[in-house]
Amino acid sequence: MGQQVLVNGHQMKVYVEGNDPETIVLLSGAGIASPILDFKEVSESLSKRYKVVIVERVGYGYSDDSNYSRDVMEVLSETRQALSQANVKGPFIISSHSTASLESLAWQKKYPDEVKALIGLDWVLPSSYEDLKENQTLFTVAYWSSKIGLLRYFPESFYIKNPTLTENELEQYKLLAYKQLIPQAILHESRLVKENAKKVPSSINPILILSFL
């Protein structure tokens, strides 16, 4: 499913569906098991009119985990490198979910010629993080519980029930959910989210933006 590309010494998965020259890049929010499988129904529907591309960040889905910085500009750099290596060319319509709004806004600010439009799916805007109360102890406990296999005793709590997945895909999803529940990359994402929000501009260049809750 998709292709593996090497970025900064880590394997990243890039999934492409559809042949239209108009390209939508789907960016997932934090903490899901596999963006490719989670967005399956969306990508299948959109691929009838667009080329749909899903990049699984390190720590997600079929991609490797990573202990590298999760600074928003580093994450953006990895996404752009993965697209380049998969021979996916812009400009792009970028559809981002939840916390991935930070990456898409940073992308539009730094590389405006690559961004044709932004689509926000339940966006978390930079200002939303100002009063965020972080609970790193909870994340750390969950991380180590995942590492020692404790969370395997509660499988139904840690993956999204997706009726569009085949039995084989559902089994893959469960395995990925166990493997990637709280990887290092997601732990580092949680620690840097407030700092990343400060690096994203509160105002952006004029562009078509659609937001859905």
Label every PLM stretch briefly.
Residues I54-S95, Y111:
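Active-site loop/oxyanion-hole signature of alpha/beta-hydrolase fold enzymes
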Residues I36-D38, S63-S69, E130:
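Conserved catalytic-core motifs of eukaryotic protein kinase domains, centered on the activation segment
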Residues V124-R152:
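A catalytic-pocket lid/entrance helix-loop region that shapes and gates access to the active site
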Residues M1-V5:
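N-terminal membrane-anchoring alpha-helices
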